Every structure is written in C-alpha cells, then in structure tokens.
Amino acid sequence: MSEYSGIRERRPFSYHDLGGQSQGLAEGFRKRCLKASDRSFSQGLQCQEINSMSALMSMEDSVFVVHAPQGCVGCASFANDLYRVGQAHRGLPIIRNARIIVTNLDEKDIIHGGEGKLREAILIANERYAPKLIFVFASCASGIIGDDIDGVAHSLAGEVGAIVVPIHCEGFKSKVCASGFDTAFISISKHVLKGERLPKQKNLVNLFAPTSVSRKDQVEIERMLAVLGLEANYLPFYSSLEKLKRIPSAEGSTAICKVFADEFMKELERDYGIPFAHTVMPIGVRNTDKWYRGVAALFGKEAEVEEVIAAEHERVLPQIEGIRKRLEGKRVFICGGTGRSFAAAALVDDFGMRLVGLETPTYDEDAQLDIEYLNGIHGDFVVDVANMQPFEQVNLVKKLKPDVFIGVPTWTARLGIPTTHVLDMKRPTMGYDGILYLGNKIADQIENPGFNEKLAAHARLPYKASWYEDDAFKFIKTFAGPAPGAVSRAAPAGGEPVIREVR
Amino acid sequence: MSAITEAPRGNCALGGANAVFSAIDRVVPIYHAGPGCCMQTTAGEAGQAGGRSPFYVSGVSTPCTNMLEHDVVFGGVDRLRETISGALEIFEADAFFVLEGCTSGIIADDVKSVTDEFSAKGLPVYPVDCPGFLGESYRGYEIAFASLLDHVVQSAPREGDLVNLFGIMPYHDPFWEGNFEELIRILEKLGLRVNSFFTRRQGIAAIRDSSAAALNIVVSPWLLKDAAAKYEERFGVPSLRWSGLPIGATDTSAFVRAVADRLGLKDRAERVIAEEEAYVYGYLETAIGALSWKRFAVVADSNTAIGVTRFLANDYSFTPIVTIVTDPIFRPEDKERITRQLTELEHAKPPAVVFETDGWKIARELDSHSEITLLVGSTNDREYAMEKGIQCSVVAYPITDRLVFNRTYAGYRGSLTLVEDLYDNL
C-alpha cells in the first residue's frame, strides 16, 4: 500500500511560486538555497478534484458520484466533451455521456451532514446502471463538514454490486492539480488492486495516459509499442474494470505524461514487482527517442528500439529539416503543464528555435534536470513557476516580445503575437508523426499571423497599462515559513521578491 | 432543498453569480474560494454555453484566494485583503465584486468587513454572499441582481423612453447575446432605448442609472421577482413579466403589443408588427414543406421550453408531445404559470408538461411517450436521440458541441434561424 500522501507539495524540494532567470534558479536549486515562497496576489488555480474526475471519466463501466454542491462538476463538462469526441474518433455508433451524479450539497446538508445523501446517490447509481465501479469524489464542502466518504462506501459494500471507490480529492488539500491524479490512483490501488499479485503476461505494458491524449496520439504510441512486440494496456482513459485488474499482470509500466501515474508506478514496482520507465513526454524527436528507449529497456529490447529509431529518423528528419528552415532562430515563449512545457521546450530545439521564456507549474528535481539541459542550449531564459497566472504571463510576453507563444492562446493572442499550442486534446501531438504535425502548425502560425494582429487592434485585456511596466514577479514573496515540502501555508511576511530582473 | 441530480443542467450559486458579473464590461469578480472554483464555475456556465470564455476576466484569470487547509483552519481574511489590494493594483475596472465560495462560507469569514475597509476609501469593492451550497445557478443570478441593486443602482430622473430588459441570464442561456440583440432591435423600432446591462459594452454606468427606466421588462416566467419588486418599491419602476422567450410572429407580436400597451405606443407597434411579420413570412413562403411534419419533445430551461414549444405548435404546426422543463422551479404558482403557457395553445393538442432536472429521469419520461420524431434539447440529450434514432436539435443549455456567438432563436428573425437549424439537422 502507498506511503505517499497524494499531495504533491509534500514531495521534497518542490516549488510552485517562483520566478527569475533560468541560470540563477538552477544554481539556487542546486545549492539548495531557494527559499519557500508564495504569491500574495494570485489568479485562480485548477483544483485537484478536476484532475481526479477527468482522469477517470471515460471509464466505460463506471458511474461517478460527486459529493459536492453542483458547481464542483463544472469542469466535468470538459471531460465529458472530450469523452464524447473521443468516442466519435473511435467510430462508436452511439455516443454516450459520462454518468455523473452529484449529491448537490445544500445549506441544510452543510449543517446536518450529507452522508445520507451520498448513500442514496450511490444506491441510485447502482440501481440505474448496475456499474462495475462507482467512483465517489470528495469536495471542499464535504471535506470541511467532515463527511466520512470511506465509511459510507464501506457500509454499502454488501448492498451494491459495484466496487465503490472513494477518492479524497478535496480541493483545499493541494494547490497542485496533478495531486488529483495521485489521489485517484491511490484509491484504485486500495480498493481495486488490493495488493493481489497475478501471473505475468509476456510483453504486456501498462500505458498510463491522461485525458489530454488524442485518439491519434494513442494510435501512434500503440503503433510504436507494437513494433517492439509490446501490447499496451491503455489506462485509465477508455478503459474498464477489467483493464484496471490487468495492471498487476504487466511486465512493465510507463506513462505518456510526466506527472501522470508517476507515484503510482513506483508503488506498482514496490508492491507488484513491475519495473517502470518514467522519462519524458514523447513530444519532439529527442523526447520521443528518450521515451521510446526507456520503455524498450524495460523489456530488454535496446537493440530493436535503436533499429526502429534509426528508421523513424530516416523517415521524419528530412521533413523536420524543411520545417527547421522555416523556424530556425525564432524566439519562443512556452507555457504548459509540467510534462508539456518541458516537452515543448525540447521540441523547439528540434526546429532550432530559441527559448526566451518558460512557464511551468512546478520546480523540483525533475524540472531541474530539464532546466539544466535547456540552459545548455539556450543560455539564459525567464522562468515563471506558475500554474497559468495570466497576469504574469502577459506582462512577461509583452516585455520579451517572442516571435511565437506556445500555450493556451487566450491572453497573449490579444497582444498580437502568433500563438499555437502543444496541448491539442483532440488532435495529434505525440510520437514521430506528431512532430511533423506540431512543426507545421507552429511554422504556419508564425508565417500567417493576421488573425492575432488584427485581433490585437480591437481586443481588450483587463490590466492597467502600468502593470506591463511593473516587475512580473512582484507578488511572489519569500517567507520564513516551513521548508518546501510542508503543505501548510504560512502568511508571506512581506518578504523580498525572489528575483527581480526580467530582460 | 437541492436534490441528488444526474447530469445537472446548472452550476452552483457562485457560478450563477459569476456568470452575471463576468458578463458586465469592465467588472472584475474576485473569488474568496477554493483553488478550482474559478475554473469549475466558468466551465460550468460559459463553458457549457456554446464553448466561449467571458472576454474580460474568467476562469484562471479571475483573482482568487485559492483557500487551502491553512485558511480553512485559521481563516482567510488576511489572504483576501492582499488579493483585493493586488487586484486593485493591476486591473483596470469600474467595480470589483468579492464572491464567496463554499470554503469561506462554511468557515464564516467576514468578507463584508474586509470590503468595507476598501469602500471606506472610496474604492468600488463590494461583497457578494454566494457560496455554492446556497443553490443552483439561478440562485446566483438572483443574488447578483440583489447585489447590483444594493451597491450600484442609484436613483435617477425618469426617462420615458428607457426600459430595462431582464430575465435572460448571461451564459446560462447560451444564446443570451443574440436573444438580447434581437429583442432590443425590436424594442428600438418602437422608439425605446434599452438597458440590458450585458450587451453592447454597457456596464456599471447603465446599471447605476437603470432606475430611470419607465418599465422593467422581465422575460422569464419565474426569475427576478425580488429584484423587480425592489425596483418598484425603491425607484417606482413598474414591471412587465413576459413568461417565456418570444419566438416567431405570434408570440413576438403579442410581446410587442404588451410593451406598447404599457407605454402608450399602440399605433407605432402595429406598424412595426406589420413590417416584421411581412419580413418573416417573406422567407417562410420560400421554403414551404421543406421540413416534414414532426411530433416533438422539448427538454429545456423554462424560457426556451415555452418559446420553442409555442412557436413549433402555434406557428409551425408541428405536434407537441411532451415538454420537460429543466429549471429547478420550486414555487407552485410558477409551475402553474409555465404550464399555462405550454398548454394554452391555438390549435394543437397540448403536450404533457413535466418539471424534471435529473438526466436519467428525463430519459425515462421521454420513454413513456410514443412516436417522438424530433427532440429539441441540449447536448446532454443527443445520446437519447441517437439511441432512439430520432432527429435532435441542440438549442438549450448545456451546449458543448456548438460554438455560439450572436445566434438567436428569439423574436422574428430568430424564428427563421430556428427553422434553418431544424432543417440542417435532418
């Protein structure tokens, strides 16, 4: 069973509010002299409940009971939309909705407790759909009032046919949304796998993939594995109880996203003897090679994978050369989730682009490896350790004036800068085929920036002109609180901004 | 009491309130809430309203205290104070509304005393008590209007040609902008000036002076009763409630006559009606028989359900079978008013009228009616239509598979668009 709490902030040397130049940060991190810090002003985050739900919402034989007021299923609409589109891309004749039941906690429940309603919701889920799994998601409200979701789930074990899996994803427990993935896997381990070992199935690999992976990407990754004679157990997107139960019979595990199932794979190694490859996201040539070699090594297929990589290079490198001619020397600012931001940074290297700014949600040991690698290529660039924080983003992008912004385009497009992104959940981005798609996408956007240019003449951003002149990191305050790794937040005592200079 | 609901067609009180504030030009909502409420509410309202994001501040650009465990235990007012100060420093805005989420609501942080510190300095920072658990989106809509009345609306001299148009909820009605625009177009033809608060970049100034209006027109069978009463009591602005979105010549002309009647514009109204009806029928007569006869079911919010059912039955001679109203209507008199609107039809036999919000129960209700050949509903309802092999048209919240800018089904012109869209779906 897991010893990991599921709270990403509790992992050692992990920072979420930081800003400065990449060389300085890397040095500070290396010497262990980066202080804990926090933003005294912040824009909204993504809570872990959103991630817990989105990770599981395409499980076909499941019902999702959300123990919360009705607002806490807002983002389930995104997950459901992805699920619906995913079914269409898989050619299914009838496109279903994810089965989401919300207990709709109200004022009365807040005072008297909502366990009765939760019990009723689970019974309703069972009666309506006779599912194999019922996932129960906690919320801030249910957590604060102290509803015992484990107790309710346990008490219904004999009454319902489904396995009831309570997930402790209360939003207030973590400011790092990826914690929600961990929390979901901890519960799957505890309630579905339960430590039972199974006979190994030769060449079976657990392939953990978050919702943000398109059908085309799944096909490409599975193709790459099949070439090596490997069978992928694709999880948990579009999977089922049966597929979850096969997890212990795999000979190896890997993940498509860097912050997805990484802690779970450690647990699978410890408890079930399943080795894993946790390298990078397979985006861009270097990263795809690295990811591919990592998986191959698990199965002793080092020689085979080199042959395949050589053949793939022969196929795609000449085409990449063509894209490189269009992109060489272009200055780029990247914003993305932990896996994608660094993957995109490696990708732009394939095209000879120059990194001038990087926004990523977490700085930790893994990030340090990537930053040091990127420092070697790009010299010095701005790093904003933030989960979005558009106010900092537009401030930095306006000052740095990159040739292209890679990330969610909502705000920087209004500055008139060409934008594109590597998180296209319905289209390809990964593997060798994905590189060409992304490269052409970036080049096309840079060469034809008319929409954003014209938009900038009319669109509005809500910030004062003075904000763009200000230090983008002025609200990041260090404080003499607990060392990074502690979850509680001491009040920032008006301390020094971390690193002020932005070129 | 809020019921357990499958596939809910709404967000929470916080989401509803935010839908309102995020639709007002140069207004910034500030959340005193958990980390995630900004995204959940924006995705729940605007995200399901034809896939857009409010232009000024929304989702992860909304200032937020992102309350964590520490704040739950020790309270979050210091954090809130810093967040408001930061927002005032960087945002260009005419007003800031501090919206409470479940976390601050449950631990009972004193938000008002913090906003008072700012308003004492003359800064436009206002508290809104709207924790999610207070109810669904519409509750938030009502709370937001109450808050605007408390903090923004001031008395102004009466202007006889000015009306306020209320009842169409931003984002929760995915076609709100188009619907406002069409109804405003028609009212302007009567010689009126119209406040909607939300369209044409109206903002705090229009809201502040809305007490000058000669009439509040509330297009909804049940919303904004309290707000309408307050306008009347405090500023002497009377209201006209119009129960259901007017769609097509019959209902829209009746709507025009009702407004004109209240404001003494009868002659002008008849001229407008003649002109608009000629416009509509000029098109309808070019596609006679283009759509085959249908026995239809409607699953939608009350405004859309009434508008679509009445138009298709009265003006288009389709056969209504069942209309399911998905709003959480709790007052019996409101249910009666809605039922009357849906059953008092011209020639058609009235449909069965059902009030239901739960997705599974809606499907079972549809099962109990035979020979439905057209289902007019939301993206949620496509699955049912696919399973049964019947035509489906998505015209009501939640909509995640269409992009909606200024499309409208309201009024004269909107009825033509509705017919076009029904044809596209064959």
Residue ranges and their predicted role:
Chain A
Residues 1-503:
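An N-terminal assembly and electron-transfer interface module characteristic of large anaerobic redox
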